[in-house]
Amino acid sequence: MGCIKVISVFLAAVAAVDARAFFHNRGGNDVIPNSYIVVMKDGVTAEDFDSHISSVATTHSINKAKRGSETVGHKDSFNINGWRAYNGHFDEATIESILNDDKVDYVEHDRVVKLAALTTQPNAPTWGLGRVSHKAPGNKDFVYDSSAGQGVTIYGVDTGIDINHPEFRGRIRWGTNTVDNDNTDGNGHGTHTAGTFAGTTYGVAKKANIVAVKVLSAGGSGSTAGVIKGIDWCVTDAKAKGALGKAALNLSLGGAFSQANNDAVTRAQNAGIFVAVAAGNDNKDAKNSSPASAPAVCTAASSTIDDQKSSFSNWGTIVDIYAPGSNILSAAPGGGTRTLSGTSMASPHVCGVGAAMLAQGVSVAQACDRIKQIANAVIKNPGTGTTNKLLYNGSGR
């Protein structure tokens, strides 16, 4: 009987340990102090979620009064295709309480997220469109299906977009802003990427509708929580507008590995939005970056005009495709143009081709596989374990 009691106590202890949520990816130089993202377990109901938030608010208030903490508590809640999470500023005692709630799956630090762009080269040639519509290099003409993304909505999740730029006239609207109160593109990065995925002159999907979603400041940085909030808004908007299945989302940004970021983009993809993301510019394995490391999305590395891997581009088995990213000419705020380099420039090429495929009847679930299937195996020195396939729009040229 004593043995049975010991076993019972042991099993109870194991169950208690298993019930505790996991803390993902602690520490790092990019951590935002006292800022956390909390992800709930699958199956948690809206009522359970609200009850948890209420309990956290009470615990936070008690701990704040006890320790004189300046943390603000719960900030935003997210529900992306059934994936429930929230972010907030909490002290360590409150986080310990959250980790011990059996409805919580995991907690992670909120982190800084930055652009995936690099350099500017004035008066550089426009070559990306010609390259993705021909099997051989050196062609300047862009050949594309006349549907050109018509009927598809592309969400540019970035620094904002200059919605008055002639490249987007009649096809763009402002969506939301999760980073500040300035509904403009003070950086230019978001306008540039939008010009590539759907600009009239410089874009791949020239007839697609565009929505500006600002998650990064004029300085080019934001937070994981801010990016997730933007993605949450996109899914909600696409659902409300009946656009799921005919929507794409470009993420030319990234940061350190974040399970929450990866989960958010995966849920957006599963909801019916084709997601293209930049691999990153550290010349490292993209498996350590997010959202590039999310398996469900289409991760783009950067190529040069000579079909080489761009020197800065991340690589690795998680990369789905190479696309033009060095010295890409596109739109700039104020009606002008600008040349930028980075995997930020590769991703919108992929997003545009994906949007064009959606317009032709390819499903969101099949789009990235289709992109990889028709791509050309021409990239030289792609990196260890990395695909050598270069984006191609299937023009037949």
Swiss-Prot record:
Pfam families: Inhibitor_I9, Peptidase_S8
Residue ranges annotated as propeptide in the record: 20-116
PROSITE patterns in alphabetical order: SUBTILASE, SUBTILASE_SER
Protein name (Swiss-Prot/TrEMBL): Subtilisin-like protease 3
First and last residue of the signal peptide: 1-19
Subcellular localization, as worded in the UniProt entry: Secreted
GO cellular component, one term: extracellular region
PANTHER family from the UniProt entry: CEREVISIN-RELATED, PEPTIDASE S8
Boundaries of every Peptidase S8 domain copy: 126-397
UniProt GO MF annotations: serine-type endopeptidase activity
Summary of the function given for this chain in its UniProt record: Secreted subtilisin-like serine protease with keratinolytic activity that contributes to pathogenicity.
Residues the record marks as active site: D158 (charge relay system), H189 (charge relay system), S344 (charge relay system)
Keywords of the record: Glycoprotein, Hydrolase, Protease, Secreted, Serine protease, Signal, Virulence, Zymogen
InterPro entries linked to this entry: PCSK9_ProteinaseK-like, Peptidase_S8/S53_dom, Peptidase_S8/S53_dom_sf, Peptidase_S8_Ser-AS, Peptidase_S8_subtilisin-like, Peptidase_S8_subtilisin-rel, S8pro/Inhibitor_I9, S8pro/Inhibitor_I9_sf
Residue span, Inhibitor I9 domain: 35-116
Family to which the UniProt record says this protein belongs: Belongs to the peptidase S8 family.
Annotated organism of origin: Arthroderma otae (strain ATCC MYA-4605 / CBS 113480) (Microsporum canis)
